[in-house]
Design a protein with these regions (language model features):
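Asp-based phosphoryl-transfer active-site loop
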Residues: 28-44, 170
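Non-catalytic pre-domain segments flanking phosphatase-related domains
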Residues: 1-34
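Basic, amphipathic juxtamembrane/active-site segments
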Residues: 46-68, 177-182, 186
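Surface-exposed cleft-lining segments at the edges of enzyme active sites
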Residues: 55-59, 87-89, 127-132
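Short, acidic loop-to-helix structural element flanking the phosphoryl-transfer center
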Residues: 57-85, 95-99
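Short acidic/His/Gly/Ser-rich catalytic and metal-binding motifs that mark active-site loops
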Residues: 40-51, 124-126
């Protein structure tokens, strides 16, 4: 049923999304944005081998990362003194998996306000097979389109993993949003981390006129490939690693984001 709700966006990167909630202009507080693969679910839909099995892979059969549903519930609940905190997801899975992925969320009792999928069929139609496994341009584009619709009082907490380049994508987005990285230098940095030139240029063009907003308050990276944190060494201070959902929850409490 969720496939019928998908909105198609072509720029700055092909994506399809579902948005259930629009925040009022005077809303203030944390907004949690989660990667799906390897951060919420123990899966890798973005692998080419996995994509070839679609639609036979069902998200309902995938295990959530231990403790993550409870963490998502806590984030949604927040301090419990008003509206529930906004919760959005970004997935490199194709939009054909909207139903199964959201069914998994329902099974886990996870309330969400929106989810963005990579428009894999559109990327393939453009003859960009090599871009199926490159996620930085897609994730930054999804964050751009989400953030431009959020009120000025929103503060983003971005959750990803070190299996790919989530830390790089999120920290680049933080610089972009704050206005310290725009234009040619943004395009160059995107290409440097693997984005196709056409998408790097499209992102730089899209970001150019946007207001400067220091909107990213935290980048939270699940340490999958290197539990020692080696893959996020040297990243900006807002980037923090977590091995377990309990670790992440404790860090959010320490930062005053959660009770």
């Amino acid at each position: 049923m969720y496939e019928d709700e998908l909105e198609r966006l072509e720029a700055p990167y092909p994506m399809q999304r579902i948005v259930h909630r629009r925040l009022p202009g005077d809303w203030e507080g944390p907004v949690f944005v989660w990667d799906v693969d390897k951060t919420y679910l123990e899966t890798r839909f973005s692998q080419l081998r996995g994509l070839l099995r679609i639609p036979f892979e069902l998200a309902i059969d995938k295990r959530p990362v231990a403790g993550v549903p409870a963490l998502l519930h806590a984030q949604r609940r927040g301090y419990g003194d008003g509206e529930r905190n906004p919760l959005f997801f970004i997935s490199a899975s194709p939009p054909q998996l909207a139903g199964p992925v959201t069914a998994r969320m329902v099974q886990d009792g996870v309330e969400f306000d929106g989810i963005t999928f990579k428009d894999v069929p559109s990327v393939l139609r453009r003859g960009r097979l090599g871009q199926l496994k490159e996620q930085v341009a897609f994730k930054i584009s999804a964050l751009l389109r989400l953030t431009e619709e959020l009120p000025a009082g929103a503060r983003l907490h971005l959750f990803g993993d070190d299996y790919e380049k989530d830390a790089q994508a999120y920290s680049l987005f933080a610089e972009l949003a704050a206005g310290s990285l725009r234009g040619f230098e943004l395009e160059r940095r995107l290409i440097e981390v693997g984005a196709a030139k056409r998408y790097a240029r499209a992102i730089a063009t899209w970001a150019g006129p946007l207001p400067e907003r220091d909107v990213v308050q935290g980048v939270w990276i699940r340490l999958v490939r290197d539990p020692s944190g080696g893959r996020i060494d040297g990243m900006p201070p807002i980037v923090r690693g977590w091995k377990t959902a309990e670790d992440a929850h404790a860090a959010l409490r320490s930062a005053g984001v959660l009770p």
